[in-house]
């Protein structure tokens, strides 16, 4: 069973929607939700371009291989597919962007900061939980804790730093509930 960021997001809104998304059901077409998705996709695209422009070309990677993440030389990556296994559950998240902060000393590991783009000016708890899900999947994939993440949002490109490690237990509970839901109905 695979729990993706789309399935996780659907669960935050409604367990039935989660079930439908996980089983591949097609949706009848909610005009508002389609508009919100289009706005978020457009915002993600433009903010990714803006963020990439802030880094030298040799420090940016698009869809890098996750196998060599710890040894990577880039400082910013976009469009990263993260996969991890927890018990019998597969987690999969499409990171909007990932910043790699090199270690300051030999004893400290390189820090990875997931970045999520949200077009709205006001963030919801769900936005923070989605970032925490990204960080949770990334931490399981790397085998180490991802403590913080960032959300870039709104007209002013406001950046919010989120302590994702503080939200990991809530993400784990939701992942377990999703797994239970999908196994009961499947």
Name what the model sees in each region.
Residues 1-107:
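Metal-dependent nuclease catalytic cores that hydrolyze phosphodiester bonds in DNA/RNA
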Residues 86-176:
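Nucleic-acid nuclease catalytic cores
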Residues 177-186:
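Polybasic (Lys/Arg-rich)
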């Amino acid at each position: 069973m695979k729990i993706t960021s789309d399935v996780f997001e659907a669960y935050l809104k409604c367990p039935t929607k989660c079930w439908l998304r996980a089983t591949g059901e097609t949706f009848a077409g909610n005009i508002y939700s389609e508009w919100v998705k289009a706005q978020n996709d457009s915002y993600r695209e433009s903010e990714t371009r803006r963020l990439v422009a802030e880094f030298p070309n040799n420090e940016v990677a698009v869809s890098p291989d996750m196998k060599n993440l710890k040894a990577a030389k880039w400082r910013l990556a976009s469009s990263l597919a993260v996969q991890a296994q927890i018990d019998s559950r597969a987690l999969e998240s499409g990171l909007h962007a990932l910043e790699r902060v090199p270690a300051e000393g030999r004893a400290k590991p390189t820090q990875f900061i997931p970045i999520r783009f949200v077009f709205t000016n006001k963030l919801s708890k769900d936005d923070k939980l989605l970032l925490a899900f990204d960080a949770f999947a990334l931490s399981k994939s790397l085998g180490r804790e991802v403590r913080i993440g960032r959300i870039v949002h709104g007209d002013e490109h406001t950046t919010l730093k989120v302590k994702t490690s503080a939200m990991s237990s809530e993400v784990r509970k939701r992942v377990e509930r999703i797994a239970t839901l999908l196994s009961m109905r499947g």
